[in-house]
From Swiss-Prot:
Residues 266-389 are periplasmic. One of its GO terms (biological process) is protein secretion by the type II secretion system. Inner membrane component of the type II secretion system required for the energy-dependent secretion of extracellular factors such as proteases and toxins from the periplasm. Plays a role in the complex assembly and recruits ExeM resulting in a stable complex in the inner membrane. Provides thus a link between the energy-providing ExeE protein in the cytoplasm and the rest of the T2SS machinery. The gene is exeL. It comes from Aeromonas hydrophila. The keyword Repeat does not apply. Type II secretion system is composed of four main components: the outer membrane complex, the inner membrane complex, the cytoplasmic secretion ATPase and the periplasm-spanning pseudopilus. Forms homodimers. Interacts with ExeM/GspM. Interacts with ExeE/GspE and ExeF/GspF. It is found in: Cell inner membrane. The lineage of its organism: Bacteria, Pseudomonadati, Pseudomonadota, Gammaproteobacteria, Aeromonadales. This is Type II secretion system protein L. Residues 1-248 are cytoplasmic.
């Protein structure tokens, strides 16, 4: 029933080389050790009929071993991920196909020896396309010959129609009709022991033994469910629920990350600008101080030293007078001959009274004119002293 989860039940499908070939399927219960349902579809176009059968069951797909290449190659050193990069070139020495068009999967390795299976990438796309169009998601895709039970002292065999499926070892297998199989067996140096799960053929040059008889599709289904080989690796690896969820939200996460980066950059720029402004302000305050008190070169704490000067001039330090002096600093700089002698600041009235000395009245008038551009200036009576101009 669709929507239910069958933990111990699996749907095993055996595809053909082309879409017109029949598709066998079987639902097997490992817990009950029985066939729940089985059948044959007319072609791959009818795979959609198995969507309800799949339901909450894992789907395992068998593909024709005749469409794959099985080879053993030798590496210069021991197998590693770095050494695996050389496998396509080593395989290219043994086959006539373009290795760039092949999907390679490592079945096993021991020392310098590596067992591979390879299939055309185009064929992979065809098989996966059939399943996708049918709404089926397979968690494993493996060659049917590796679903045969391995034989400890030889090969295992199964006849399907006019073809023989033979498993020659843990990572090796072939598919051949009777005439080709007879030629292959005749080429063996010593007779091969073959355990057949279907009636024995009349093929000499081999030691044929009858294995336990079993329904071909059931035999393959059981073997597939116990086999680790899987063509769904690399670019064909099925997505987990987490991966699908992540792919859906990846763009959102990227945009959010970019926005956060922009925000942090702007914040950093703002803090940098504030730091630069603070540095500039401190430099300006030092300039103001040196303009008002040009004779003092050692400046450690501008605020403290300014307060000391104000005390000497008879004025209690206040923020207001510091601000006014800061704004008047450029004016003092324009009239270098004019020097403040006494300051009086009335915070309530916002009024600063200055008693200054200058070489002459021209400097005082110049100071009044410049300060008058920003402040309201009233000039009191002046007195001329000897030695002052």
């Amino acid at each position: 029933m669709a929507g239910e989860i069958f933990v111990s039940e699996s749907l095993v499908i055996r595809l053909g080389t082309n879409a017109q070939q029949p598709v066998e399927w079987l639902v097997w219960s490992a817990k009950e050790e029985e066939i729940i349902a089985s059948g044959i579809l007319a072609s791959a176009h009818a795979l959609g009929e198995l969507r309800e059968r799949a339901g909450g069951r894992p789907v395992v797909t068998l593909v024709p071993g005749s469409d794959l290449i099985f080879r053993r190659v030798s590496l210069p050193g021991k197998y590693s991920r770095q050494a695996a990069a050389a496998l396509p070139y080593l395989l290219e020495e043994q086959i006539a196909s373009d290795v760039d068009e092949l999907h390679l999967v490592v079945l096993g390795h021991e020392g310098h020896e590596v067992d591979l299976m390879a299939v055309d990438k185009e064929k992979m796309q065809i098989w996966l396309g059939w399943l996708q169009q049918a709404g089926l998601k397979s968690q494993q895709l493996l060659p049917d010959v590796l679903a045969l039970p391995p034989a400890a002292d030889g090969w295992s065999a199964l006849q399907l129609g006019k073809e023989w499926l033979l498993r020659q070892g843990p990572c090796q297998g072939i598919v051949a009709d009777e005439s080709l199989l007879a030629m292959l067996l005749a080429a063996e140096a010593d007779p091969v022991t073959i355990h057949s799960h279907t009636p024995l053929p009349a093929i000499p040059a081999a030691n044929w033994l009858a294995a336990d008889p079993e329904l071909p599709m059931l035999l393959l289904a059981k073997g597939a469910l116990n086999c680790q080989a899987n063509l769904l690796q690399g670019p064909y690896r099925p997505q987990t629920e987490y991966s699908r969820y992540w792919l859906q939200w990846r763009k959102v996460a990227v945009v959010a990350g970019l926005l956060l980066l922009v925000a942090l950059t702007q914040r950093g720029m703002h803090l940098y600008q504030l730091a630069e402004q603070d540095k500039a302000l401190k430099a300006e305050i030092r300039q103001v101080y040196t303009r008002i008190f040009p004779g003092e070169n050692r400046i450690v704490n501008v605020r403290s030293q300014m307060a000391q000067h104000l005390k000497l001039l008879g004025q209690t330090p206040q923020d207001g007078v510091l601000l006014l002096l800061t704004e008047l600093a450029p004016t003092f700089a324009e009239v270098p001959g004019l020097k403040p002698q006494v300051l009086r600041f009335d915070a309530a009235r916002g009024e600063l009274r200055l008693q200054v000395t200058a070489p002459g009245f021209a400097e005082i008038e110049r100071f009044r004119e410049l300060a008058g551009k920003r402040f309201e200036v009233q000039q009191g009576e002046g007195a001329q002293h000897r030695g002052q101009g």
